UniProtKB/Swiss-Prot annotation:
It is found in: Mitochondrion inner membrane. The gene is MT-CYB. The lineage of its organism: Eukaryota, Metazoa, Chordata, Craniata, Vertebrata. Pfam families: Cytochrom_B_C (PF00032), Cytochrome_B (PF00033). A ubiquinone binds at residue 201. This is Cytochrome b. Heme b b562 binds at residues 83, 182. One of its GO terms (molecular function) is metal ion binding. It comes from Tamias minimus.
Length: 379
């Protein structure tokens, strides 16, 4: 009798995805982040579900309902902080996953890559709307500032912003719809993840060398299932250390003050994982220009398959490109730091230089270095 996992219509899909999947024999720990992102998504959906059971999306009661979750609900504080810090772990894994893709040339699977970029946008939108829900000062003013950016769109901008707000300012209607969208988006993300995996399994995984690995494949289970479990244990360890020892490390103290439309906080800033994009937004004095730069800072990822000039796929054997890649990483750290600083000298000029460097490295320097490295191959 044939094994049920190979014949059952539903189980065989799981079998081809996680058990008998042929995987390259040399993929490193950098390939663990896909499964870690899956675990993050599951953690976020489960903790979010339990939070939604006790949360009320009304301006009068939202803040106190979060307080009630933390004080009165059994392990409510744990669920709330796992959800808040789970978002941070999600973004750490996301950035490392994208960085891995850039370094090893995984973007040459362009359907998989483009779905991944769409996923990044969807996760960022979800995180932004989630940050608004506790209805603290930074929630309210963050929502006001970021939604207001859409007013920079010519002709329809103001109408669009008021339509999103559901009124003439961020208010009850805004909070209610943000809660609805924050609830539905993770399920849309889950569907997109399945499409992401579908396209990935059409081609098979990339590997550190960037070479075709068809001649040397091993089954996903038990080799990579065990490897993924190790990664998952380390992820949960890191998350629980954060949640149980310093749950507010990555949060903003202003969000422990209930939202007050009459009092603006001295420094409005988003969560740490948006700071690099926020710094790029602020580095351009023009509103529309800033918004375009903000969107392009993420959308530029879709250009990588077009900008790939090298004859080699991976950066493993390209030391000059490696050097430039790590300068780009350092530049992103600089932008993240600048995004959290007040708008004053010398931070303004540092932010502008870092923003210019970000786009220059991606659009000009990396392709130019790739062409130079192609020339070196002939020496």
């Amino acid at each position: 009798m044939t094994n049920i996992r190979k014949t059952h219509p539903l189980i065989k899909i799981i079998n081809h995805s996680f058990i008998d999947l042929p995987a390259p024999s040399n993929i490193s720990a950098w390939w663990n982040f896909g499964s870690l992102l899956g675990i993050c998504l599951i953690i976020q959906i489960l903790t979010g579900l339990f939070l939604a059971m006790h949360y009320t999306s009304d301006t009068m009661t939202a803040f106190s309902s979060v307080t009630h979750i933390c004080r009165d609900v059994n392990y409510g504080w744990l669920i709330r902080y796992m959800h808040a810090n789970g978002a941070s772990m999600f973004f750490i894994c996301l950035f490392l996953h994208v960085g891995r893709g850039l370094y090893y040339g995984s973007y040459t699977y362009f359907e998989t890559w483009n779905i991944g970029v769409i996923l990044l946008f969807a996760v960022m939108a979800t995180a932004f709307m989630g940050y608004v829900l506790p209805w603290g000062q930074m929630s309210f003013w963050g929502a006001t500032v970021i939604t207001n950016l859409l007013s920079a769109i010519p002709y329809i901008g103001t109408t669009l912003v008021e339509w999103i707000w559901g009124g003439f300012s961020v208010d009850k209607a805004t909070l209610t719809r943000f809660f609805a969208f924050h609830f539905i988006l993770p399920f849309i993300i889950t569907a997109l993840v399945m499409v992401h995996l579908l396209f990935l399994h059409e081609t098979g995984s990339n590997n550190p060398s960037g070479l075709i690995s068809d001649s040397d494949k091993i089954p996903f289970h038990p080799y990579y299932t065990i490897k993924d479990i190790l990664g998952i244990l380390l992820l949960i360890l890191a998350l629980m250390i954060l949640v149980l020892f310093s749950p507010d490390l990555l949060g903003d103290p202003d969000n422990y003050t209930p939202a007050n439309p009459l009092s603006t906080p001295p420094h409005i800033k988003p969560e740490w994982y948006f700071l690099f994009a926020y710094a790029i937004l602020r580095s351009i004095p023009n509103k529309l220009g800033g918004v375009l730069a903000l969107v392009l800072s993420i959308l530029i990822l879709m250009l990588f398959p077009i900008l790939h000039m090298s004859k080699q796929r991976s950066m493993m054997f390209r030391p000059l490109s490696q050097c430039m890649f790590w300068i780009l990483v350092a530049d992103l750290f600089t932008l993240t730091w600048i995004g959290g600083q007040p708008v004053e000298y010398p931070f303004i000029i540092i932010g502008q230089l870092a923003s210019i460097l970000y786009f220059t490295i991606i659009l000009l320097i990396l392709p130019a270095i790739s062409l130079f490295e192609n020339k070196l191959l002939k020496w």
